[in-house]
Amino acid sequence: DRQGSPRPAPPIRFQRWSQIALGAPVLLVLAFIYVPIAVIAVLSFQGPQGGATFPLRDSGTLWYQSLTDLTVITEHTDYLGQAVFDFRKSIVNSLKLAATTSVISTVIAMAAAQAMRTRFRGARITTYVILLGIVTPGLAISLGIVTLASELGIRAGLFTTGIIAHVVWTMPFSFLVIMVLFNRFDRRVEEAAYTLGASRLRAFFTVTLPMMKPAVIGSLLFAFMLSFDEYAHSIFIMGSDRTLPLTLVSAVQLRITPSIF
């Protein structure tokens, strides 16, 4: 009777080939993602006579030294000597927008996730509506917000149409991050707090929120990175305000220098 006997282990040679077959596609994907980033990092050490060419014609740290020269890094000038691109202001705008967006998205996502836990009628449809911001094209969202703002007489800007578009984009991701931890949350801890006389509000701030701290931090960081690097949701909605991605794209269209890398 061999039904209870263990199966023989596969040959060592077969194990090695299976590891190679599984590992090769993973290595190709990682190379596809990270090799262009490595090339850009190497090009940043291009010499003064080199441009966006590989391999390097010369090497040096000239373009890193130019980061301390505000006339070089913060202003590209046209033939009249007028400032065209202000990188310093663009960086500040991106930091302000990303920080504000991350906080607002996390607060809204936390409230939405808390509501989803009650399993009310229509909760599944509401979840799909919340996640629409992920699958909707950024240009469509931007154009819709700008059109609505124009009808309402709201001026397009960083903290008007800009913040709305970025919250619409980042909030679904924050919602998913928070819901992952909520699905593993032990409700008995909250029920114990209610039994001891804590109100729902007090139980949330003293029990639920501390236990959700990893999800809150992850949501803040995720939303910040998405907002800071976002271009499609910013192209039509910033008005005269410029974020770093918008300024970088405009600068690259005019001239590519290793300082941009």
Region locations from a protein language model:
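Transmembrane alpha-helices
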Residues: 24-27, 32-35, 167, 175-179, ...
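Periplasmic/extracellular loop-to-transmembrane helix junction in inner-membrane transport proteins
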Residues: 49-101, 253-254
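Interhelical loop and adjacent transmembrane-helix boundary motif
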Residues: 13-19, 51, 61-75, 228-261
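A structural signal for multi-pass alpha-helical bundles of membrane permease subunits
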Residues: 34-49, 90-93, 142-154, 162, ...
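Membrane-interfacial helix termini and adjacent extracytoplasmic/periplasmic loops
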Residues: 7-12, 54-55, 84-85, 122-124, ...
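Transmembrane-helix boundary motif in ABC transporter permease subunits
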Residues: 1, 9-15, 96-130, 143, ...
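Hydrophobic positions within alpha-helical transmembrane segments of bacterial inner-membrane proteins
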Residues: 31, 35, 98-114, 139, ...
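N-terminal signal-anchor/first transmembrane alpha helix
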Residues: 1-43
